[in-house]
Regions:
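Short glycine-enriched nucleophile-adjacent loop
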Residues: 117-128, 133
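Conserved small/polar residues in nucleotide/adenosyl-binding loops
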Residues: 136-137
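Alpha/beta-hydrolase fold nucleophile elbow
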Residues: 102-114
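Serine-hydrolase catalytic machinery in alpha/beta-hydrolase-like enzymes
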Residues: 4-103
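Catalytic beta-strand/loop cores that center a nucleophilic Ser/Cys/Thr
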Residues: 2, 14-17, 110-111, 125, ...
Length: 137
């Protein structure tokens, strides 16, 4: 199960994300899970929870500020309207949030699917402090 958290993007504006923690109290590697073009929907929340079940501290930054859709045309419009620099800023904020968490081991990676895969590539180029970068496109 995920919980909604508020945090700051790298540049300081407030943003939100879904977080799932692994069982127990041990420190765990962190994963930034970047959404698909549908938004941070139930599927992304489920993936966040499943990754936590595998022992990761997971955060899924909400790049659409709460908007989700099931309609491909609307998803395309949301993706086209996405400001890539702002999204990378949000991913950087998620990385910083993980690194500041007492549950995080200090290792942080980023992964994503579809649009999230492309954003993971952008983050790999522009977000310092990542331990690993994986994309599924």
């Amino acid at each position: 199960m995920t919980k909604r958290v508020k945090l700051e993007a790298r540049s300081g504006f407030e943003m939100q994300a879904e977080v799932a923690e692994p069982a127990g109290d041990a420190r765990a590697p962190g994963v930034v899970l970047v959404q698909e073009w549908w938004g941070v929907n139930d599927h992304v929340k489920d993936l966040t929870t499943r990754l936590a079940g595998e022992g990761f501290l997971v955060i899924a930054p909400d790049l659409y500020d709460g908007k989700t859709t099931k309609d491909p045309a609307e998803a395309g419009a949301l993706m086209q309207a996405l400001d890539t620099a702002r999204a990378v800023d949000q991913i950087a904020g998620a990385v910083a949030w993980l690194k500041a968490s007492p549950r995080c081991s200090g290792k942080v990676g980023v992964t994503g699917f579809c649009m999230g895969g492309a954003m993971s590539f952008a983050a790999a180029c522009h977000v310092p402090g990542l331990s690993d970068r994986k994309s599924v496109v």
